[in-house]
Amino acid sequence: MNKLTAIVLKGFRKIYSKFTNKNSHNFICETNPERASEMIYNLLCNNKPCMIARFGSTELNAITNYRGIKNHKNQVLNFIMNKTPQWWWNEKGLEEIFSCSGFFPPTTENVSRFAEMMITDMPQVDILGSWRPEEKFFSKELAHASKIELEILNPYWSKKPWTRALANKKILVIHPFAKTIQAQYAQREKLFNNPEILPYFELITIQAVQSLGGNDQFNNWFDALEWMKQEMDKVDYDICLIGCGAYGFPLAAYARSEERRV
């Protein structure tokens, strides 16, 4: 794509969106924290595999970009009207999925492979923390998912937090700051006024790969992902809580495919 042409097309799209509000996030989703908390709680308590997830910003940008390239090439008018995604590679987006989400190396081949994997995993989502307008480009894949406003995924907004479902369970947490989480959990009774926000459970942790800082332990992001899957397979757990950048969504889908709740 010629750089000048890309600038002009994006300019027209921006003007169109400004006057029509077509780029706003206006999906129907649950905004009441009590109802949202009950939805999550009930899902976690029915003892069936489930996946509660959200998209990262840079990851979804890259996936959307890939979908535009694959399915919507040269659809100028639809692009301007924000009906289809950008159909040429966004160089800034490729940089950001590396610098902000730790995906490496951010080649178009690797990002294409990542996008295909993410799109394949999307139908496994049962509840989606919704916040990005680009979600509309994946309405078919997400048709099964109930949507709640992203912020109220956090349990502390509800008087009856969904985290009470964790009580007396084996809880696996995958996060780069695993040791800090263990130390904080030891002080759990001092952290919140409502004890149901962080009840007693058996805490198991896996230190996630932190590839934002140029971790060279693995040849690529996919190798790091496979290593974390293998670490998960070594653990007996009931529910998994994951917070590890671009690795999070695929690991959650893997846990669900293994008949777990995440």
Question: Which residues does each predicted region cover?
Answer:
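Electropositive, gly/pro-rich neighborhoods at or near active sites that engage anionic ligands
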Residues: 3-200
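A short, acidic, amphipathic alpha-helical segment used as a generic capping/interface helix at domain edges
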Residues: 35-39, 111-113, 223-235, 247-249
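Glycine-rich phosphate-binding "P-loop"
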Residues: 141-147, 204-227
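Short, catalytically relevant binding-site loops at active-site mouths
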Residues: 178-181, 210-213, 247-248
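Conserved small/polar residues in nucleotide/adenosyl-binding loops
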Residues: 259-262
